[in-house]
Design a protein with these regions (language model features):
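N-terminal membrane topogenic signal
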Residues: 1-19
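Membrane-interface helix-boundary motifs at transmembrane edges
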Residues: 6-7, 54-67, 125-130
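Membrane-interface helix caps and helix-loop-helix hairpins in membrane proteins
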Residues: 31-37, 61, 84-94
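Cytoplasmic-side transmembrane-helix entry/capping segments in multi-pass membrane proteins
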Residues: 41-44, 62-74, 96-99
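Alpha-helical transmembrane segments of multi-pass membrane proteins
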Residues: 49-53, 74-82, 107, 111, ...
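Interfacial helix-loop-helix junctions of multi-pass membrane proteins
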Residues: 85-86, 90-95, 144-192
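Membrane-interfacial alpha-helical segments at the cytosolic side of multi-pass membrane proteins
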Residues: 103-122, 159-165, 184-197
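Primarily interfacial, aromatic-capped hydrophobic alpha-helices that serve as membrane anchors
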Residues: 132, 174-222
């Protein structure tokens, strides 16, 4: 485990418990004051708390507490506030902000996936300046797949629940297209800190998460 990852171990555990407690409280609240749909969302949220741990186990990754913390904060904003609390409808522009954030973070996930799939050199993850555009296009592609996949999920939910999560009745295809567009904008915005890291070695917040992953999983080098 890298020193950077270890420094966030306690904060990661606090975020994990906070997300779980939030889902439990909202499940009880929705049981008495809302609909079965929101009770289901709250209970499902409890399952999502374990997603980072499950992903590590399935992919045989080492524990990276900084990446875990980022995942819990993202789940809280996108799922906890956005879906369980219904923030997408209650808070102006929250939907578009979260889709942009999704583009940024899944661009980061795409970059991590690029080096996870890339053959290691002497058992280590090695980042080369020359492969910036390869990694950048790959990361944006992952974000695009997620954006399209999410819209497919919303379409399927509408077929089952008839709750129009894509707002087709009042916006036509506008909401769906804007969601995908701002997600891609977020993925392209991620290229800025990514380029600074490749060109100048500037780590920053987002690339710090990436570097923590590299060092935690087989001692990455740049």
């Amino acid at each position: 485990m890298s020193e950077l990852s270890a420094a966030f171990a306690q904060k990661s555990r606090i975020a994990e418990w906070t997300l779980g407690i939030f889902c439990c409280v909202m499940a009880v609240y929705n049981l008495f004051f809302s609909t079965p749909y929101y009770v289901f969302l709250s209970v499902l949220g409890l399952a999502l708390v374990f997603v980072p741990r499950i992903a590590e186990w399935v992919l045989h990754l080492q524990k990276d507490y900084l990446l875990r913390l980022t995942s819990y904060l993202y789940l809280f904003l996108v799922y906890g506030i956005g879906m369980i609390f219904n923030g997408y409808d209650r808070i102006p522009l929250y939907d578009k902000v979260m889709h942009t954030l999704t583009g940024v973070l899944f661009g980061l996930c795409g970059l991590i996936a690029f080096y996870f799939l890339k053959p290691k050199q002497n058992g280590k993850i090695v980042v080369c300046k020359e492969e910036f555009w390869q990694a950048a296009v790959f990361s944006a592609g992952i974000a695009a797949i997620i954006a399209i996949g999410w819209e497919i999920v919303e379409f399927v939910l509408d077929l089952i629940l008839h709750n129009d999560p894509q707002h087709v009745l009042d916006t036509g295809v506008n909401d769906t297209m804007m969601d995908m567009i701002v997600c891609m904008v977020g993925a392209l915005l991620f290229w800025l800190p990514m380029h600074s890291y490749y060109a100048k070695g500037k780590r920053g917040l987002l690339m710090g998460i990436f570097e923590s992953f590299c060092h935690t999983n087989s001692g990455g080098e740049k």
